[in-house]
Amino acid sequence: MTIFEALRHDHDTQRELIDKLIETSGDTKTRHALLEKLKHELQEHAKFEERYFYDPLIFKDLTQEKARHSIAEHHDIDELIEELESTDMSSPAWLATAKKLHHKVHHHLDEEEQEVFQLAGRALSDKQKHDLAQKYDANMH
């Protein structure tokens, strides 16, 4: 398995969770549980993705700009989650913020897979791609 396959697997989980979250309504146990699960998944993924994927990329000219941009998007996503947690789940404002988060997560994941992965594929050796996947997977799962 390469780092790209490992990350893509978790991206699929994140897409599924955020898609389910915006289909919920009201201040329900389901909505609370999905938000907590999504928050945990996104935070853990960002932590280990930054450590085992973006850290080696930030020092390479080819990938430095994209790595910094993606890390900044992780922080934007964290802020939207904080906003959701401080908003009444039954209010229209909560759903509006959840939809912003949905858009941001999908945009971020698509951009990583379509742009960052291609550049990283050229910047990392085959050995690095496999070694980083093992380290990421061992910590994430």
Identify the residue ranges that each predicted region occupies:
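Small-residue-biased structural context
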Residues: 1-141
